[in-house]
Amino acid sequence: MARKALKLASWTSVALAASGVYLYSNNYLDPNDFGAVRVGRAVATTAVISYDYLTSLRSVPYGSEEYLQRRSQVHLRSARRLFELCCANRGTFIKVGQHLGALDYLLPEEYTSTLKVLHSQAPQSSMQEVRQVIREDLGKEIHDLFLSFDDTPLGAASLAQVHKAVLHDGRTVAVKVQHPKVQAQSSKDILLMEVLVLAVKQLFPDFEFMWLVDEAKKNLPLELDFLNEGRNAEKVAHMLRHFDFLKVPQIHWELSTKRVLLMEFVEGGQVNDRAYMEKNQIDVNEISCHLGKMYSEMIFVNGFVHCDPHPGNVLVRKRPDTGKAEIVLLDHGLYQVLTEEFRLDYCHLWQSLIWTDMDGLKQYSQRLGAADLYPLFACMLTARSWDSVKQGIGQAPVSATEDSEIRNNAACYLPEISQLLNHVPRQMLLILKTNDLLRSIETTLGTRSSASSFLNMSRCCIRALAEHKKRDAGSFFRRTQISFSEAFSLWQINLHELLLRVRALRLACWVSALLGWLTRAPHRM
């Protein structure tokens, strides 16, 4: 009996050893691939974070200086633990972490500043894995498809990485290859997040982050389908074809699949790289203006919005043929399609914000689900204080003091913010994320909250609302009347913009004259 047991143990050991060698040789022996490891890590991190909040703030008077200080420390510790979890579990976790890191004025700064780093911390697939995906999806080896293929990726993201390659006909292309394990893990990861969010809500009733899970559940399958990304790229290129400053790389459909996307290779600097713009004599204000026009057109006029404009996805360059500044828009996996009702309400809301119509602000905020929290909603949309909203967001640029106040208030109003995010239409969530990403770019460029950006938004709102009215108009006379009203409103905006420029020019001349007088003054004495 003992001999049989020994023999069985020997054969079992051989089988396990052989399995281990096989798994190792095929690069599958990765703890992150085992569901139990990923689940255990996520559960443990959630438990530690929850325990920290429960115990660290228990004995401190709410709202006191000590409470605020301790809460900030807990936020920072928790953000770092969440960051480590995202880096360890990768894939979907990094994607969700990046989303949270983009919500600059909606979440405490400790979280956004910590998680923002995930945009540059995405894992890379090995060349063996890249070859495997290309072989499985395109049915050929890399050397059969490309004259050359750079092993080092141009960039890696949470779901994929991009390599530079040259086709046999000499064309230079960018090859986007999905990480091989993301597809299989994504649905399980989202289910795990859903369970954890529900569990945490039992401990903290004010913790309402199911909206984040719902968004991931809806959007991740679309982002993992690169054919969908290619269709989005072609749609937005056609939709914004009248903007000569926009470049969307062409898709090569013959070598594209759900996990591999081949596109035209376009070089440029990141949109937040001021040094690159200065070196290439690209006007920062012009780029900021173009970016604002492009997104206003997407949101207010077309209702088809690129929702991931972080700096790595928006490049700038000088056009080779004309030398004019050009924006290159990349990564078209995540778009938000706005319903007409939402788009028109959002147009009315921004018109109310721009022209300080407080009754309209309340009415359209409530139509969009803000209820009595409409002042907070206005602050979230504009990233301005309620005092600035009441005075007019175009009247004065945001100050460092106001910006700091808003960021601090995000921590104080976290329960109300999460409640609001659970009640607004789902379409609003990605719009808020997009707003914050664009605002971050403008802050880096030093062009935030310029009057011209609000005027461009207002132009698009007027056009969108007029187009809707003309479609519903029953007669030619009524359509003509609407067209005249639209033209008059646009003329008023143009006149207002002209007056602002004249005022700025006069101020510049006055300052120049004053500086000239000051430099000459010592010689007179």
Curated annotation (Swiss-Prot):
<keyword id="KW-0809">Transit peptide</keyword>
<dbReference type="InterPro" id="IPR004147">
    <property type="entry name" value="ABC1_dom"/>
</dbReference>
<dbReference type="Pfam" id="PF03109">
    <property type="entry name" value="ABC1"/>
</dbReference>
<comment type="function">
    <text>Appears to be essential for maintaining mitochondrial cristae formation and mitochondrial function by acting via YME1L1 in a kinase-independent manner to regulate essential mitochondrial structural proteins OPA1 and IMMT. The action of this enzyme is not yet clear. It is not known if it has protein kinase activity and what type of substrate it would phosphorylate (Ser, Thr or Tyr).</text>
</comment>
<dbReference type="GO" id="GO:1903852">
    <property type="term" value="P:positive regulation of cristae formation"/>
</dbReference>
<dbReference type="GO" id="GO:0005739">
    <property type="term" value="C:mitochondrion"/>
</dbReference>
<feature type="binding site">
    <location>
        <position position="176"/>
    </location>
    <ligand>
        <name>ATP</name>
    </ligand>
</feature>
<keyword id="KW-0067">ATP-binding</keyword>
<dbReference type="GO" id="GO:0010637">
    <property type="term" value="P:negative regulation of mitochondrial fusion"/>
</dbReference>
<keyword id="KW-0808">Transferase</keyword>
<dbReference type="InterPro" id="IPR000719">
    <property type="entry name" value="Prot_kinase_dom"/>
</dbReference>
<keyword id="KW-0723">Serine/threonine-protein kinase</keyword>
<comment type="similarity">
    <text>Belongs to the protein kinase superfamily. ADCK protein kinase family.</text>
</comment>
<keyword id="KW-0496">Mitochondrion</keyword>
<dbReference type="InterPro" id="IPR011009">
    <property type="entry name" value="Kinase-like_dom_sf"/>
</dbReference>
<feature type="binding site">
    <location>
        <begin position="154"/>
        <end position="162"/>
    </location>
    <ligand>
        <name>ATP</name>
    </ligand>
</feature>
<dbReference type="GO" id="GO:0005524">
    <property type="term" value="F:ATP binding"/>
</dbReference>
<protein>
    <recommendedName>
        <fullName>AarF domain-containing protein kinase 1</fullName>
        <ecNumber>2.7.-.-</ecNumber>
    </recommendedName>
</protein>
<feature type="domain" description="Protein kinase">
    <location>
        <begin position="148"/>
        <end position="477"/>
    </location>
</feature>
<dbReference type="GO" id="GO:0004674">
    <property type="term" value="F:protein serine/threonine kinase activity"/>
</dbReference>
<dbReference type="InterPro" id="IPR051130">
    <property type="entry name" value="Mito_struct-func_regulator"/>
</dbReference>
<keyword id="KW-0547">Nucleotide-binding</keyword>
<keyword id="KW-0418">Kinase</keyword>
<dbReference type="InterPro" id="IPR045307">
    <property type="entry name" value="ADCK1_dom"/>
</dbReference>
<feature type="active site" description="Proton acceptor">
    <location>
        <position position="308"/>
    </location>
</feature>
